[in-house]
Amino acid sequence: MEREYEKNFYVEKASDIAARAQYDDNGFAKVELLPGVYHGGIQSFKCFLKAGHKVSPELFADKSVVIFFGKGEGELTDCDGVHKITEVAFYVPFMDKEKYEIHAIEDMEFVYNVIEMNQWDRAAFDRWHIRLPYFRLHSECVQYIQDCKGPNTEARMILCPKWHGRIILGTTRAVGEGTVEKGHPKVHQLNYCLGDSDFHMSVGYKAENNMETVQHHAGDWSFIPAGADHDLVSDPGKEVYYIWFEHYTDEQAMAKM
């Protein structure tokens, strides 16, 4: 397959992200992640909200948003009431139809993803999508089994295929193992590291013997272009814990699925 990107993977470390954070008078900072790298229609931002402060994120009529709450306790208030954020959590607002507000009880960190919707995305969304707004704590999400993952690896599905356009969302968590995956030729993958993460991410093309490895820790962000093989595995006693966020590359084909 023709490769769109020069590198096997792109990484931004948590410390570098935090160093770029500039707080406003409301205790809020937003930093774009890997700016200019992924040109497939998703912009991701690491957000920091200090304890005791609130933020009402921007609403979009023609774009969708997915939020990963990775650190710190808080509350999210929307048309369904008050959602307690007591662990890793996920939120998909109903575009510009319903407002919402995030209140930090502790210092919070979360990733705010803005997804463009072209004509194919919009047609698929209008035909069928999950009821929005959608809030889930990580522990409420269904577990799944996959043959590329270790026997003691916990995997959870957050957004199944076609639930919300071309995006697919889940988590992987383990100690001393992880996932060893063949490249997905039609799926780009973004990763957000959580918990006590300390693991190896190796990406490339095994048939070409060009795998490259980077050490990942909590708060790190990475992008794996479609097609690359990828292993995310921790050493004994170390944790691998990350959110994977996939974007299907062929919107016309997916619209027909």
Each language-model region and where it sits:
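Short, conserved beta-strand element in jelly-roll/cupin
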Residues: 59-76, 183-205
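Short histidine-centered beta-strand/loop micro-motifs
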Residues: 54-61, 178-185, 213-214, 233-234
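Generic N-terminal amphipathic/basic segments
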Residues: 1-43, 47-88, 97-99
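A short, N-terminal "cap"/entry segment at the start of jelly-roll beta-barrel domains
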Residues: 1-41, 118-180
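Short acidic-glycine-tyrosine-enriched beta hairpin
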Residues: 78-97, 207-226
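Short, charged beta-turn/beta-strand-edge "cap" motif at the junction between a beta-strand
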Residues: 97-101, 228-231
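C-terminal functional regions that serve as terminal interaction/effector modules
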Residues: 188-192, 212, 217-257
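Double-stranded beta-helix
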Residues: 5, 105-147, 235-257
